[in-house]
Amino acid sequence: MSVIEARGLRKSFGATHALDGIDLRVEDGRILGLIGPNGAGKTTALNAILGLTSFQGDLRVLGRNPWTERDLLMRDVSFIADVAVLPRWIRVSNALDYVGGVHPRFDRAQAERFLTRTSIRSTSKVRELSKGMVAQLHLAIVMAIDARLLVLDEPTLGLDILYRKQFYDSLLNDYFDRNRTIVVTTHQVEEIQDVLTDVVFIDRGRIVLVSSMEEIESRFTESLVSPANLDAARALKPIYERQSLGRSVLLFDRVDRTRLAAIGDVRTPSIADLFVAVVGGRSAQAQGLVQ
């Protein structure tokens, strides 16, 4: 059974189509990055998945309709939107008490074990913690819930690089396994590239690319080309071209790397560079990627 399956998923706000006919399937044991510019439909998609907004089309999350079966669904789903959602007046111990009282699959002992690895005291109030410590507290609570699906919407927004790294390290080492699925949105794409198993690019309410990381590595190639070889490189029909330190960087889709290596240095593009090429719309050829 798919964890998430959407067919023709739509959501409109007046004349604005926040989601415009999305088809998506997410299997067990995947870490999916949902990537798009502001206003692309990322948060609306997550809200639909979490049963926080109505929708048109067909959407099943863990086999349930999230809008009509949300109470049952949320027993198997955890969500982090932003660390600021924790009340500033509450003590750490009281936060654990509260979650234990409302969520039947919360393991308080496990949350306390996670917190022993931090400098957070159980008697501290949230307002006494740094933003990074609040993120650690929130993650400890979420990881102590035995959920099959974890949804993260900009979970490290505003944190410094050290806390961001600790956040994702804890997520991978202490929570993720092949029986769980994670969906994450973030603007810090370069920091989660090595964490993801799959990516979805969304723009203007439509999905423009769905790919596993393995497929990206085999399908897309960047070539750094000197001026002398630029015409030969362009003849191979790159989908995107940019300049870097006096050299041309061309992005190719399904072009043999051996041919590209003969005219320049080759590498797999970063997710950020691929996103700019596909979603930026700066090359007419990029439209061939739209699904």
Predicted regions and their residues:
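Conserved ABC transporter NBD signature motif
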Residues: 51, 55-68, 72-73
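Catalytic Walker B motif of ABC-type/P-loop ATPase nucleotide-binding domains
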Residues: 150-154, 159
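C-terminal coupling/interaction segments
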Residues: 240, 244-291
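ABC-family P-loop ATPase nucleotide-binding domains
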Residues: 81-138
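ABC transporter nucleotide-binding domain
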Residues: 166-252
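Walker A (P-loop) phosphate-binding loop of ABC-type ATPase nucleotide-binding domains
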Residues: 37-41
